[in-house]
Regions:
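Non-catalytic pre-domain segments flanking phosphatase-related domains
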Residues: 2-14, 18-91, 252-265
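Soluble non-cytosolic domains of exported or imported proteins
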Residues: 43, 58-69, 84-85, 125-133, ...
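Sec-exported extracytoplasmic/periplasmic mature domains
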Residues: 76, 80, 103, 140-148, ...
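Surface-exposed patches in mature extracellular/periplasmic domains of secreted proteins
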Residues: 79-88, 149-154, 179-180
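Active-site neighborhood of HAD-like aspartate-dependent phosphohydrolases
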Residues: 81-88, 97-129, 144
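Structural recognition of the beta-strand scaffold that forms the well-ordered cores
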Residues: 88-91, 98-99, 148-153, 201-204, ...
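Short, acidic loop-to-helix structural element flanking the phosphoryl-transfer center
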Residues: 121-150, 157
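C-terminal cap/substrate-recognition subdomain and adjoining C-terminal extension
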Residues: 156, 160-265
Length: 265
């Protein structure tokens, strides 16, 4: 997850996210949000459909479980085929391995724009994220297969101990200060550091820049072109999780049918 930009969600955006989802997440501080006296009328309610789908829909649960099941099958195959013993998996955390939608829902209900990310520090310290369905089991399997696991996230380094504690509470393996790599160097540089010591056989994320620095700051048209170029990776050594709650696609113009609206009488 990447830290940047404001957020807009629409029902059409949610539908488009069912197969491939990207997201961006900005810098987070720890200030307290002020509640609106009339939250039902505030602009951030436009986030509601995407957030409701991510947190409450059985379809989201199915996609998450499906992704981790297939990733687990591919992981076993890759371990059997690998000649190197220094194998590694790299994963993002937020909305990839752990679910933080309770924070987003709290902010939205208080009419606070969660795209500002100024409430995230409090969540890192005191919040109770849940595991994405299938995630803990997948990483436990990787651990049993002797694969090193690196958690790369743009959570704040100052809250590293709290993030480690949250991951341990959710039964994620190989959680240490060496293997939980938080905000500092760009994600691409953190991945490169791991690649110098291991053969990375799989990556997981909820945004395209979780896989390659080529996607960082790329416009949507460029992202789609890169997805075509990288198609062989998806479902093989790259696995992307759905996240329609925020993303670099938020302000994209929608293509619409130009026929005159007619309703049946």
């Amino acid at each position: 997850m990447k830290r940047s930009t404001s957020i807009a969600c629409t029902s059409i955006a949610v539908v488009s996210m069912l197969s491939v989802a990207g997201c961006a997440a900005p810098d987070r501080a720890g200030t307290r949000a002020e509640e609106s006296p009339n939250p039902e009328n505030c602009a951030v309610q436009e986030h509601a459909m995407g957030l409701r789908w991510q947190q409450q829909s059985a379809e989201a649960q199915a996609l998450q479980s499906q992704t981790y099941r297939i990733a687990g099958e591919r992981l076993e195959e890759k371990v059997k085929q690998a000649k190197s013993k220094d194998l590694a998996v790299i994963t993002d955390l937020d909305e990839t391995a752990i679910d933080n939608t309770k924070l987003l829902a709290r902010d939205m209900t208080a009419c606070h724009d969660y795209s500002v990310w100024d409430t995230w520090g409090q969540w890192e310290l005191k919040g109770s994220p849940s595991a994405i369905p299938g995630a803990a089991e997948f990483f436990q399997k990787a651990d049993e297969l002797g694969v090193s696991i690196y958690y790369i996230s743009d959570r704040t380094e100052e809250n590293l101990d709290a993030t480690i504690a949250s991951l341990k509470d959710l039964d994620f393996p190989q959680v240490s200060k060496d293997q939980v790599m938080l905000l500092g160097l760009p994600k691409e540089e953190r991945r490169t550091k791991i690649q110098k010591e291991h053969k990375v056989i799989m990556q997981l994320g909820d945004t395209l820049h979780d896989f390659s620095g080529d996607y960082a700051n790329a416009h949507l048209d460029q992202q789609r072109q890169l997805v075509e170029k990288d198609a062989k990776h998806f479902g093989d050594d790259w696995f992307i999780l759905p996240n329609p709650t925020y993303g670099s696609w938020e302000d994209a113009e929608l293509d619409k049918w130009d026929a005159k609206l007619e309703t049946k009488k």
